[in-house]
Amino acid sequence: MQNEKGKNWDESRHDAVIIPKMRSKLQKPKLYRVFLFNDDYTPMDFVVFVLKNFFKKSFEEATHIMLNVHQNGVGECGIYSYEVAEMKVIQVRECAHQNEHPLQCVMEWK
């Protein structure tokens, strides 16, 4: 029997290369919680606006979180990967600054 190059093929020889099966261990990304903190100056409507626009919350969800912020001093906006959480914190801080509100937004490792 001949192979594609015309050389004799020895069927008794095993020319197969055995590649060991490697398991790649994918790690789940670390998650971060994003919080808003209450202050005496930021209007409740602005907090709802932030939650709807930057965290994609419904009006009802945003209102519920805003009331948590108002009554408890802090409210959780969501849980995200590091990059997403960091971007949301930056967006909220910039928006608050542009609108002259002292609203504080932070992220914390879960």
UniProtKB/Swiss-Prot annotation:
Q: Which GO terms describe its biological process?
A: protein catabolic process; proteolysis
Annotated transmembrane regions: none
Gene3D superfamilies (alphabetical) = 3.30.1390.10
Summarizing the function annotation, the protein's role is: Involved in the modulation of the specificity of the ClpAP-mediated ATP-dependent protein degradation.
- Similarity section: Belongs to the ClpS family.
Q: How does it assemble?
A: Binds to the N-terminal domain of the chaperone ClpA.
NCBIfam families attached to this UniProt entry: PRK00033.1-5
Protein name from the UniProt record: ATP-dependent Clp protease adapter protein ClpS
